[in-house]
Amino acid sequence: MTDGPRAAAPRFFPQHARHLLGLQGMHPTRIEPFLDLAESYALMSRSRKTPRDRLLGRTVINLFFEDSTRTRTSFELAAKRLGADVINMTVASSSVNKGETLLDTAATLNAMRTDLLVVRHSQSGAPALLARKVEASVVNAGDGTHEHPTQALLDALTIRRHFGTLHGLTVAICGDVSHSRVARSNIHLLTAMGARVRVVGPPTLIPGAIGALGVDVHYTMEDGLRDVDVVMMLRMQRERMSGGQVPSAREYFRFYGLDRKRLAVARPGALVMHPGPMNRGVEIDSRVADSDQSVIREQVEMGVAVRMAVLDLLSRAGDQS
């Protein structure tokens, strides 16, 4: 990858070749080559041989309207490993906090001649709106309860590294599905790749129409985790909840927390995943989070590799447009 001319960018993101806004509708024949590229970046990162000229002279702006140290840092590290100049903008330090509209921000960023724009926003659809207004390529780093595509891609890469494929696996996504953009992106990707997906949680945190996405719904952990290959726990997002959806953190853990007893009904060696940040003692027991079955730290590592691949491909797509 580090030698010779740069190849034309494969169109892994069919709806918006220059942007990554979501995973709905992405075809498996596009996902597998992307995961291959991300895997190569993971191997290069481990050997400290990343192509630092890949984004040389390019500017990446991380525009985060919501706090997220983990995701922002992952994108920043990915961009720097490819040689890009990186600027981090947060609401607290931007003109948005002084009344500037999103469209005003788009006009300002256009004037700056930004190459790649990584956006996190509390409102679903905000990255898509920016993508229509800016010349830069836009990456959705999480928008409201809509999607978080790079999280699902890194989850898929992590799973594939252990099983070799996603096809035929059974994955349980457990917890606060209603407020989770991670759950939605994973459902789109996993079902497209031939995995069977279950969603597990209290009725108050499972959307009524979720079955239309091709998933099975379970309201007890014992039923939902039986014979699954992967257990993906979700954070309880109290900041997005209305009152009364969950009685208390203690009650939630009592019925829906992942402990060793509940994990025992999954297949032997089932992977334990979590997008972070974890609430230990709420959705997951520390002994499970830190066990040999946990791949939570590996997810973080794969996140940098996936985001390197995304930034690389979108920069090449921008060259062709």
Curated annotation (Swiss-Prot):
HAMAP family: Asp_carb_tr. InterPro entries: Asp/Orn_carbamoyltranf_P-bd, Asp/Orn_carbamoylTrfase, Asp/Orn_carbamoylTrfase_sf, Asp_carbamoyltransf, Asp_carbamoyltransf_Asp/Orn-bd. It comes from the Bacteria. Belongs to the aspartate/ornithine carbamoyltransferase superfamily. ATCase family. GO terms for cellular component: cytosol. One of its GO terms (molecular function) is amino acid binding. L-aspartate binds at residues 98, 181, 235. Carbamoyl phosphate binds at residues 70-71, 120, 148, 151, 276-277. This is Aspartate carbamoyltransferase catalytic subunit. Its EC number is 2.1.3.2. Pathway: Pyrimidine metabolism; UMP biosynthesis via de novo pathway; (S)-dihydroorotate from bicarbonate: step 2/3. The keyword Signal does not apply. Catalyzes the condensation of carbamoyl phosphate and aspartate to form carbamoyl aspartate and inorganic phosphate, the committed step in the de novo pyrimidine nucleotide biosynthesis pathway. Keywords: Pyrimidine biosynthesis, Transferase. It is an enzyme of class 2 (transferase). The keyword Zinc does not apply. GO terms for biological process: 'de novo' pyrimidine nucleobase biosynthetic process; 'de novo' UMP biosynthetic process; amino acid metabolic process. Heterododecamer (2C3:3R2) of six catalytic PyrB chains organized as two trimers (C3), and six regulatory PyrI chains organized as three dimers (R2). It catalyses: carbamoyl phosphate + L-aspartate = N-carbamoyl-L-aspartate + phosphate + H(+). Pfam families: OTCace (PF00185), OTCace_N (PF02729).
